[in-house]
Amino acid sequence: MRKECHPLLRGGRKDNKFRQGFSSSEMESLASICEVILPPLPMDALKIKKHDDVSIEDVEFFWNTSASHYPIPHEVAEILSKRSLIEAVILIRVVLWLLATRLGTFLLCGLLCFSEKWPFINNFSSMSLKKRERVMQWWLKNRFITPIRLAFAYLKVLCLFAYFTWVDENGDNPAWKAIGYEVSADEKLPNSSNGRLLEKGIVETMHETNSTLQQSLTEKGLNVTLDSRNNILKVKCDAIVVGSGCGGGVAASVLSGAGHKVVVLEKGNYFAPRDYSSLEGPSMDQLYETGGILASVDSRILLLAGSTVGGGSAVNWSACIKTPHEVLKEWSENHNLSLFSTSEYLSAMETVCERIGVTESCTHEGFQNQVLRKGCQNLGLKVDYVPRNSSGNHFCGSCGYGCPKGEKQGTQDTWLVDAVENGAVIITGCKAERFLLENNRNGSGRKKKCLGVLAKALSSRVTMKLQIEAKVTISAGGALLTPPLMISSGLKNKNIGKNLHLHPVLMTWGYFPESTSELKGKIFEGGIITSVHKVPSRDSNSYSDTRAIIETPSLGPGSFASLCPWESGLDFKERMLNYPRTAHLITIIRDKACGQVTTEGRVSYKLSAFDKENMKCGLQQALRILKAAGAVEVGTHRSDGQRVKCGEVSENEMAEFIDSVCPMEGALSPGENWNIYTSAHQMGSCRMGMNEKEGAVDENGESWEAQGLFVCDASLLPTAVGVNPMITIQSTAYCISNRVVDYLKRDQI
């Protein structure tokens, strides 16, 4: 790893203390489950050939080790207790408690727990490894005990994520050598990126105390007074922006550029390029919402959302695709939102692309994008280069953990830099609790007026609340956080928290041995998304001209293992040995169905039949592309490990296999097989509408209920975009921010 990085991104448990609260019997059951998921195996069980750059000693170590070894079960319990929904915690603890008893083991495992020796019935941890594996294989497919299946799926994800992302104080994991993974040690950063570009505008509450915070804020040019009776710091400014991502960063820049004093609240921390470690585990923990392990309430979908200065733009995969014409037409005509048919919006897209340095070329593509491009070309399919907010020769597979080279131009490197230069102040480690609302008496038609935000620092050393009073308040926390904040503030519009679109994702994979493929590289090397194939719609009256888009993902070993199907311990270890050459393609759909998020951390969502059909078409096309690119084996992430070896079947059999592929429901569904979906794009949960029946905010982004409260993030988009939405979010935010500037001008008259 890079020698210099931020302590929070370095890895290695600092205090060696676990505080998950699990009993010793529960931990014993958990460790025995972890052992089944990733067991120790004899070397004679190894059936596949190791890769040339991997030593037999490294493979032997990996083959003999187990996920039951300290500290993995404790890490799993820690993640579970701190990051998971309460229902999941209760379910899993009940299962672990039952498995710690003989009667409970009999209820969950049946006759396999019987023994010839006294007391004749074993608890789970006393059963042989072989019998425990048979039990978990039964759980995997059993349609009558789906809660147990869900518990297994949850533990499988956490166990494998913890095992393959755990690092010591030196940033190393001994299993990585066996699977051919390494973290880039590139220390050469551009001179412009060596410093902290936002330093003069940042107040980091994790470094503050009650006695220092007021002085730090005052030194940044803010009007601060102490209300010692109520233990509140009162801050006055022109505009308060909650969130620093694609929407908040743009808003802060535009408003401060118009001469207004802006304060940005960000609950995450600030990291400069030199701070990034490219370590999957510590980076996910610090840079993503809920440490990158945020699941829907039924655990069907895992959601990725940024939680750091720069928000999603700091950790996204660089794709910069303009809003499709068909989408703009739909929003302007079907939703009567004239903004999206104006030259103002088209001009905003150009301004955004120029500010974040979008380029449309790619000098050298990484392995997975080579696979996508070659497969499409061999099939005669159109494949496009994806514009990125980096240079054409940017060859970095670590941008999902923050770009260590400082080339990717997130808001923390662009819009927020402009804002700080214009006097904006960014307060990190500070979470908004509610908007400050009062009854509106000025006859604007809105019942409430927003006066600012009440917030709290997340550092235990700062116990004072912050009451930030402003002329305008902008909510830019993203589609998962803006609705709960508005609802907790007392707003009632029925659209708040509804209409949530996720761009659901399923993956397909193909294995390309180095000895049989002309495509070079490993899946974690090179630009993450540089190519895209659009699966066209055959119906001119369809919801979209494109049924699905096919791109490539960023998959560190922890994410790869978490999403990969588990059939047995042996099969899984063999899959991991093939990790660096197992190319993945993601199928993303423009979902017509929508979910809801009205309480923080609780997302409900279900695909429609229309969406499933589009997903099926995308998955099948992705498999054809992988085969055409030269994969020797292809498959999906369906729970039963659905796959086929390309050279061992006829063309007709291959076609039959591909035609059989379709998306499944989640682990709680009654079917034998199931899927885990992912989502990195959340939109529409506080959508713009022509009236308060159609949306939560108007065409200017202002709440229909509260004067002076604006939304400026992905939540105000009317529908799903259908492509990577960063340019759409920033362009919409740019237009909304300029309208907020106009609002402030009118307010001064």
UniProtKB/Swiss-Prot annotation:
Any one of the GO CC terms: membrane
GO molecular function, one term: long-chain-alcohol oxidase activity
GO BP terms: alcohol metabolic process; response to cold
Membrane topology category: Multi-pass membrane protein
Subcellular location, record wording: Membrane
EC number(s) reported in the record: 1.1.3.20
Induction: Down-regulated in leaves and apexes by cold stress, but no changes in roots and hypocotyls.
InterPro entries per the UniProt record, alphabetical: FAD/NAD-bd_sf (IPR036188), GMC_OxRdtase_N (IPR000172), GMC_OxRtase_C (IPR007867), Long_Oxdase (IPR012400)
Enzyme class: oxidoreductase
Result of altering residue 396 to G: Loss of activity
Tissue expr: Mainly expressed in floral buds and apexes. Detected in roots, stems, leaves, flowers and siliques.
Highest taxon of source: Eukaryota
Keywords, comma-separated and alphabetical: FAD, Flavoprotein, Membrane, Oxidoreductase, Transmembrane, Transmembrane helix
Active-site residues from the entry: 681
Annotated positions binding FAD: 237-252
Regions that span the bilayer: 94-114, 144-164
Reaction(s) catalysed (UniProt annotation): a long-chain primary fatty alcohol + O2 = a long-chain fatty aldehyde + H2O2
Annotated function: Long-chain fatty alcohol oxidase involved in the omega-oxidation pathway of lipid degradation.
Family classification: Belongs to the GMC oxidoreductase family.
Domain remark text: The C-terminal part (725-748) is necessary for enzyme activity.
Name of the protein in question: Long-chain-alcohol oxidase FAO1
Organism this protein belongs to: Lotus japonicus (Lotus corniculatus var. japonicus)
